[in-house]
From Swiss-Prot:
It holds the Pfam family E1-E2_ATPase. The chain crosses the membrane at residues 105-125, 129-149, 163-179, 335-355, 363-383, 671-693, 698-720. The active site is at D414 (4-aspartylphosphate intermediate). It is found in: Cell membrane. GO terms for molecular function: ATP binding; ATP hydrolysis activity; metal ion binding; P-type cadmium transporter activity. It comes from the Bacteria. This is Probable cadmium-transporting ATPase. Its EC number is 7.2.2.21. It catalyses: Cd(2+)(in) + ATP + H2O = Cd(2+)(out) + ADP + phosphate + H(+). Its main location: membrane. The gene is cadA. Gene3D superfamilies: 3.30.70.100, Calcium-transporting ATPase, cytoplasmic domain N, Calcium-transporting ATPase, cytoplasmic transduction domain A, HAD superfamily/HAD-like. GO terms for biological process: iron ion transport. The lineage of its organism: Bacteria, Bacillati, Bacillota, Bacilli, Bacillales. Keywords: ATP-binding, Cadmium, Cell membrane, Ion transport, Iron, Iron transport, Membrane, Metal-binding, Nucleotide-binding, Phosphoprotein, Translocase, Transmembrane, Transmembrane helix, Transport.
Amino acid sequence: MDSSAKTLTEDKQVYRVEGFSCANCAGKFEKNVKQLAGVQDAKVNFGASKIDVYGNASVQELEKAGAFENLKVFPEKLANSSMQAVKEDTKAPKEEKIPFYKKHSTLLFATLLIAFGYLSHFVNGEDNLVTSMLFVGSIVIGGYSLFKVGFQNLIRFDFDMKTLMTVAVIGAAIIGEWAEASIVVVLFAISEALERFSMDRARQSIRSLMDIAPKEALVMRNGQEIMIHVDDIAVGDIMIVKPGEKIAMDGIIINGVSAVNQAAITGESVPVAKTVDDEVFAGTLNEEGLLEVKITKYVEDTTISKIIHLVEEAQGERAPAQAFVDKFAKYYTPIIMVIAALVAVVPPLFFGGSWDTWVYQGLAVLVVGCPCALVISTPISIVSAIGNAAKKGVLIKGGVYLEELGAIKAIAFDKTGTLTKGVPVVTDFKVLNDQVEEKELFSIITALEYRSQHPLASAIMKKAEQDNITYSDVRVEDFTSITGRGIQGNIDGTTYYIGSPRLFKELNVSDFSLEFENKVKVLQNQGKTAMIIGTDQTILGVIAVADEVRETSKNVIQKLHQLGIKQTIMLTGDNQGTAEAIGAHVGVSDIQSELMPQDKLDYIKKMKAEHGNVAMIGDGVNDAPALAASTVGIAMGGAGTDTAIETADIALMGDDLSKLPFAVRLSRKTLNIIKANITFAIGIKIIALLLVIPGWLTLWIAILSDMGATILVALNSLRLMRVKDK
């Protein structure tokens, strides 16, 4: 990182913003902040209602930059602590929900004046003073906030949607169209209110995440159990979690057994059995036993805190579609102003048209040109999709990755820990000699492997524990590790060997026949590591160990193929026989074996050259270079490792693949909805503008087309909150 970038990061200040009414206003606020002295850069996160300021600026300066919308700005830490203090102060009155009639009183009053205006119109006539005054009252009351911003924009020659509306209303009033001017004001206010409502609904998914973890925990201090706020809990403290309580902090169980519902973090609906040395996460539910948990992270570093932070950051990342809309809107509004002026002036000047008629048509063009629907077409979709994904245990770190995942043509899977569980288990055990019983032989194997450093020894120890096979009374002498071959040890005067077929070939064991060797090869061809137990005279048995394939892997690959992703490739460092056995079992379309980390990286680059958009899924640790090189890097088990959350573009918080097809479906649906929104928003404008040619465009049609498009686009985007994990 260069020094300027480093300085920029160090001077970053994050503020919460209250009062955003639309995405366009957020963009304008960002522009104003960037122009402040001492500010090097600024970035508004409309989805999270935040702004990142790089440089030095006071809260007063920031609020002045947002005065056009009466924005209120709070430093993030202060905002969070204030919100928390209000929540926890039991004496403080609960925040009352503002009734609809109070929240929108000016809008309701303006609508009432319109109703009375039309009543007066029918009774007293159109040109009656009372009728006109009622419509004027509706315009002034309903359009006060609109005009306040619109006039400021006109003075600065800053053309946005409020400028268009202000000019349209003033123009309509000048030519005496009081009724239609008041209708434009009220319908525009309704449109803005609906936009705010839609965005608040989309943001609610993140607010609900913030309330998942308790804010206090029962902690053991000086031999006493006391309730402490999570901000005051330190790493190393012992937390007591009773049955039915939510876990407040991340930690490791030091005492107790329970089933913990981790749906809030991983999306898994089935409770997970937890015992001593298992990790637990803040926000998860302890369903059964009493647990004593040693705290391993401060509150700001817990998994749920990182998820919330990264999801908010993700919502602020502009997706390619949003970048297109922002760029388009920048030129769109001035072009609409020019078209409206031409419509109003050209026909009367050059073709003898009526000034009243064509000025009216020009004003209608201004109203049609309001880009409300276009501006919200992408942000509501992105916020809804990312929030929904987070609730289902899929952490997507930006709109750009959401879009790219929907366009992938191939997915590469790291084998170990992704398609397989990453933990070796005993799959086969056969006694081949009548001189020894099965339990006795396994006891000998366990006693020898207990002294071994071989990675597969843990599988044998676990199997012995499950089958209650004791080995502590088996005395092993002269234990030796035979590098690359196996192990040996003396038990009751007999030397036993455990190792590869190669070891027993070298020992010239008499019953190592071709038939036996073929049986071993059958196990090896199934992707298992076969080990032989025997003496230098005879073979006593064979034991096979394998990295067990996940139950969900085959189904996930099938679902991806059904979604049209035909290229599913397994990358592994295993030998070809093992790789082919596992690959055939799960159903991947291609297998690449005996790969080093650099080979995986090179293969991903090759895939990108062939297929364009390529995703790579792994554990985010030893395959980090390949994840980084892919179009979209997806990490498994994000709940258990900070590395996975930090390095990947997308993290599956649960330690299984079942969320991957859901993530692909959600991203594709998001892409389709964004495209449909943009097409519809632009299409409805074009249709309305074409009504100018026969002179059919009215202010009524213009504002209704704009409001209708805004409502439909918002509702269409909110559908993404309801996409289910099938």
